[in-house]
Amino acid sequence: MTTGQGDAVSTALITGASSGIGESLARCFARAGHCLVLVARSSEKLKALALALAGEYGVRAVALPADLSQPGAVPALAARLRRRHLTIDVLVNNAGVLAHGPFVEMTAQHQQQMIDLNVSGLTAMLSQFVPGMVARGRGRILNVASIAAFQPVPSLATYAATKAYVLSLSESLAEELRGSGVTVTVLCPGITATPMLSSAVEASAALARLPDFLIGDVDAVAAEGFQACMDGEVIRVPGALNQAATLAGRATPKWLLRRIVGAIGRTTI
């Protein structure tokens, strides 16, 4: 069992692993023979998933519940890994939170929660684990962003801004680490059938009317992210429709793009 970088058995740490894209990514890595460290806030779901994956694929799967939005959570997680003599070869930063609605109607607490997890937590994980990968001369990083990273999204203003940060940081880090043996991939999915989407639909009747062809299959999205990570691809946008939308957005003048996305946001988000 290898990661394709010459090491015998690799360990993949996946945040936000208890459901959605994170859970599907955990299955992808387990299927490929990687040992797993699963991180999320939901202790019971995490432990059940670890047991299921260990039984199904015969890999070691460790559940380490943690809230990465909290100060000190990342160093504490690293200390727990050291006590278990676990070295992380693949880091998957998938944990994230979404809150939608007009900016002025959202509480400062909701805004800060997105920044604390989507930006600060992810950055802390990179700062904690990337130096060791570079020192060892091998490693893979998969950061999960969104197609919202490519354009302003009124009604998802802060969320889109956090994902733009993830995209920019990932691209910059990929170039910084080129030639080091450590690769950086950023996965930018569109709307995907996850518990996060289900929660958003409950809060927005308009979202419930989205046609099925606009909603990506979570396992297919995860499979694309896994393969892109293994291939060392820098940016992966799953799905032809999302790829076309991203290209169209980049070719559209910014002022017009803001108007278009704003109009869509006012009617569907």
Model-identified regions with their sequence ranges:
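Active-site helix of classical SDR
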Residues: 126, 162
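Residue(s) in the substrate-gating loop at a strand-loop-helix junction
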Residues: 146
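C-terminal helical subdomain
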Residues: 186, 208-245
